[in-house]
């Protein structure tokens, strides 16, 4: 009741001013911005043909000095004696309801009222006896969800059946959970997870690196999903939900820097586009950052959704300044996100894409600089040639290629949403071309990588009934494309396609259905539900812990989509339902984000401090380690058990196929030993420096000097012995004599593996314990 009196007095002052009988004076606001206050920045109309409308309405109440400061530009056609009915709605509940006759206030100018224009900037002091009764929590609770509605009736309308005017003001206290002190620590911790993964992989703890990398990427996916969900153009997003989700827009590249915004403005204008000026003029515009429900019963009361679509009073377009300068600008979805980030809508696409490209540039330059630093330290003999960084020095080129795929899959939701949305905006011809190019490049990289993974996996299934054999035995392929599939079980490598499809569909519908909030919310909920059910059913990730981690993330995503389904007002539920859901959304996501961040911090700390963090993880059940070329050390006579285990693994692989398939494979691979090296290949990486295809031959291991055999991969070791100067090849004659008579070229290639040696029945039979699965596991960051 207290603030109702304050608000009513402000409105009454407006009526007095337009009648010409009241005093008004321009006032300089000397109250600090951080002082306790309540404010409203727009006056919304909540009925057809309202006789009071406002194109600008800015009112602030400061309890410390009991002062109301207002700046109003409105028009009224009210005449005669009027009765006012005022309501205070807090979190969807009607907590106060007051009715009074303007004539009872004793102001001649208010009884009767006169039509006219209201254009005033002034102040008014409220009695302290009134302001002291207002609850103090209203000034401190973040993202206050409260609004005041005032309906005017003719004095003789005692039944309140025919309202003359209906206006509504959204209240705020300036406190919010949207803060850089939440956004940037979250971003920093997420980045630390990825950096820690790279570091521990270099020093040899591959299992730890794989799990940290997988969890870090899942963390990014969660943050991106939350940011994308917040971009849906639903009917009503309560303040606390809108503010909290704004903290994660950095994951979409939505980061405001003044100098870059100036560059983007210039670029838009220089390429025959028109820059938006809403943010630059927000102090003189009346803006509602989202549609608001206005009733405890339902948002359909007073036809509020229909009124906001009234083009005579409201506009949702930022492209016509002459339009929104005389009307109330209603922002929702991506428009709201851009406004809350203080980014002009015309710069939204460029902001997200440029920050992604900048991050990509920094990562690539850092990798090159690190390579140069290692070379300098090695040449200065500060770093040993055989240090843990040798594999990076030798394979830094392929590491950069793998990094491009890694960043592409992380940025795919961001790039696809921003590019497709830009197609609907056409801010300038050049920006549209930029959107096409960047979308084609990122999509092309992922499509290429996905096709390569599917070809390799299907070939391995056809030859060995096990996709892990070729996916993990070809170290060059693993190093380049491994990030696309190593987080999944070997037989679930195909889950890469559902994951990319899920990300693309979400981005597509959020981008193109900005003006269809109800349909958009329903489609996104169905997509989330379908993906969550499939994820729980198939459980494609590499182990139980990672599956639980990802299922929990997508469960929260599903709940968020469910909440936004209600925010779209599809069910016309009471406003209190949406308000309570918003509070639950904030608490749920805040607690869950805190858990994920603490989990990342603890995992990274243990990885850096634990003497051997790999012991915390169980071996992969798909036995992928067995198919990776092992490290062969000097023979010391302690190799009996290991050689028997090797022969057993080879025998197991042989029993996976029938006799006809085995003969076909033996004959085919034997042909390949003497095949022309110029055989055409579909892809350029079918032959690599790490491959054994043209160097494998059926000679006994005792015929050559024992040498360490290490795969040339940044994730597998320090290089194969066949590349070293001391490597002794079998003579050409020996290989020719042992090869089959039929030397025709075959399209099939020999898998890079120490388990198969062509047509010979002989195999390497001398291994010691240092060449066991543990060595391979410690030199592969994906395991």
Curated annotation (Swiss-Prot):
<feature type="transmembrane region" description="Helical">
    <location>
        <begin position="183"/>
        <end position="203"/>
    </location>
</feature>
<feature type="compositionally biased region" description="Low complexity">
    <location>
        <begin position="688"/>
        <end position="697"/>
    </location>
</feature>
<dbReference type="GO" id="GO:0005789">
    <property type="term" value="C:endoplasmic reticulum membrane"/>
</dbReference>
<dbReference type="GO" id="GO:0071476">
    <property type="term" value="P:cellular hypotonic response"/>
</dbReference>
<dbReference type="InterPro" id="IPR010308">
    <property type="entry name" value="TRP_C"/>
</dbReference>
<keyword id="KW-0812">Transmembrane</keyword>
<dbReference type="InterPro" id="IPR040241">
    <property type="entry name" value="TRP_Flc/Pkd2-like"/>
</dbReference>
<keyword id="KW-0472">Membrane</keyword>
<feature type="transmembrane region" description="Helical">
    <location>
        <begin position="548"/>
        <end position="568"/>
    </location>
</feature>
<feature type="transmembrane region" description="Helical">
    <location>
        <begin position="493"/>
        <end position="513"/>
    </location>
</feature>
<feature type="topological domain" description="Cytoplasmic">
    <location>
        <begin position="452"/>
        <end position="492"/>
    </location>
</feature>
<feature type="topological domain" description="Cytoplasmic">
    <location>
        <begin position="543"/>
        <end position="547"/>
    </location>
</feature>
<feature type="topological domain" description="Cytoplasmic">
    <location>
        <begin position="204"/>
        <end position="211"/>
    </location>
</feature>
<feature type="transmembrane region" description="Helical">
    <location>
        <begin position="522"/>
        <end position="542"/>
    </location>
</feature>
<feature type="glycosylation site" description="N-linked (GlcNAc...) asparagine">
    <location>
        <position position="65"/>
    </location>
</feature>
<feature type="transmembrane region" description="Helical">
    <location>
        <begin position="348"/>
        <end position="368"/>
    </location>
</feature>
<feature type="transmembrane region" description="Helical">
    <location>
        <begin position="431"/>
        <end position="451"/>
    </location>
</feature>
<feature type="topological domain" description="Lumenal">
    <location>
        <begin position="23"/>
        <end position="182"/>
    </location>
</feature>
<feature type="glycosylation site" description="N-linked (GlcNAc...) asparagine">
    <location>
        <position position="28"/>
    </location>
</feature>
<feature type="compositionally biased region" description="Low complexity">
    <location>
        <begin position="768"/>
        <end position="783"/>
    </location>
</feature>
<feature type="topological domain" description="Lumenal">
    <location>
        <begin position="569"/>
        <end position="581"/>
    </location>
</feature>
<protein>
    <recommendedName>
        <fullName>Flavin carrier protein 2</fullName>
    </recommendedName>
</protein>
<dbReference type="GO" id="GO:0016020">
    <property type="term" value="C:membrane"/>
</dbReference>
<comment type="function">
    <text>May be responsible for the transport of FAD into the endoplasmic reticulum lumen, where it is required for oxidative protein folding.</text>
</comment>
<dbReference type="GO" id="GO:0009272">
    <property type="term" value="P:fungal-type cell wall biogenesis"/>
</dbReference>
<comment type="similarity">
    <text>Belongs to the transient receptor potential (TRP) ion channel family.</text>
</comment>
<dbReference type="GO" id="GO:0030148">
    <property type="term" value="P:sphingolipid biosynthetic process"/>
</dbReference>
<feature type="compositionally biased region" description="Polar residues">
    <location>
        <begin position="756"/>
        <end position="767"/>
    </location>
</feature>
<dbReference type="Pfam" id="PF06011">
    <property type="entry name" value="TRP"/>
</dbReference>
<feature type="topological domain" description="Lumenal">
    <location>
        <begin position="233"/>
        <end position="347"/>
    </location>
</feature>
<dbReference type="Pfam" id="PF14558">
    <property type="entry name" value="TRP_N"/>
</dbReference>
<feature type="compositionally biased region" description="Polar residues">
    <location>
        <begin position="704"/>
        <end position="748"/>
    </location>
</feature>
<feature type="signal peptide">
    <location>
        <begin position="1"/>
        <end position="22"/>
    </location>
</feature>
<feature type="glycosylation site" description="N-linked (GlcNAc...) asparagine">
    <location>
        <position position="323"/>
    </location>
</feature>
<feature type="transmembrane region" description="Helical">
    <location>
        <begin position="403"/>
        <end position="423"/>
    </location>
</feature>
<feature type="topological domain" description="Cytoplasmic">
    <location>
        <begin position="603"/>
        <end position="783"/>
    </location>
</feature>
<dbReference type="GO" id="GO:0015230">
    <property type="term" value="F:FAD transmembrane transporter activity"/>
</dbReference>
<feature type="topological domain" description="Lumenal">
    <location>
        <begin position="514"/>
        <end position="521"/>
    </location>
</feature>
<dbReference type="InterPro" id="IPR032800">
    <property type="entry name" value="TRP_N"/>
</dbReference>
<feature type="topological domain" description="Lumenal">
    <location>
        <begin position="424"/>
        <end position="430"/>
    </location>
</feature>
<feature type="glycosylation site" description="N-linked (GlcNAc...) asparagine">
    <location>
        <position position="156"/>
    </location>
</feature>
<dbReference type="GO" id="GO:0055085">
    <property type="term" value="P:transmembrane transport"/>
</dbReference>
